Amino acid sequence: KSPPAATAAGAIALPSVTLGKPDSRKLKLGWIGCGGRGSGAINQALTADSNVQLWSIGEAFKDKADAGLERIQKIHPGKVSVDKSRVFAGLDAYQKVIDSGVDVVILTTPPGFRPMHIKAAVDAGKHVFAEKPMATDAPGVRSVIKSIAKAKAQGTSIVDGFVWRWTYAQRDTYKRILGGDIGTTDPDGYFG
C-alpha cells in the first residue's frame, strides 16, 4: 500500500535492494513464529532499515513468545515497541498479530501453517515475508498461488526466504555451471 512497506518487505529478504522511496514513518513489523529461524528473520528485518520497529509478536506457546521478545529486545532495544498487550499466544496468535496494526508480517512458523497465515495476511492487506517453504502440499501451494495473485492485484508484496537466486554471485555461478565452465554436472549428486 505504501512504498516504505514494500521497501521493508523487500529489504527483509533483499536488504541491498530498495523497492520504494522511503519516508519518515516507521514500519510496524509483526513477528509470527518465535523459534530459531524466526529470531534470525526478525533480527535481519530490524537490521535492514532504520525505519522499522517490531510492533507485535505471536507464537503458539506463551513462554516462547516471551523468550523471543526478551531475546530481540537485547539485540535491538531501540527498535522493539511491543507492549504486553501485543504479545499473543495460541493457535490464533497469527490473526491477532495481523490485526494489531502492523504493516508487514514476518511468517516463520512451521511451514504446514504457512498457506493459511499468508492468506490471512494478504486478505488483511499486509505485506508478507514468508520463510521457505511457503507450502508443504499441493492444496497449500494452490492456496499460496491464489494469495500471490491477490497480493499483486491489491499492490502488496509477498517475499519468501529463498533469496540466493537473487544474489549476483549465485546467479553468475549458476550461469557458469549451465554454460559448461566446470564440465558436465550430475544433477543427482546434489541435495539442497
Feature annotation, model-predicted:
Residues 2-126, 142-155:
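N-terminal glycine-/serine-/threonine-rich beta1-alpha1-beta2 phosphate-ribose binding loop
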Residues 127, 134-192:
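A contiguous active-site-proximal alpha/beta segment in oxidoreductase catalytic domains
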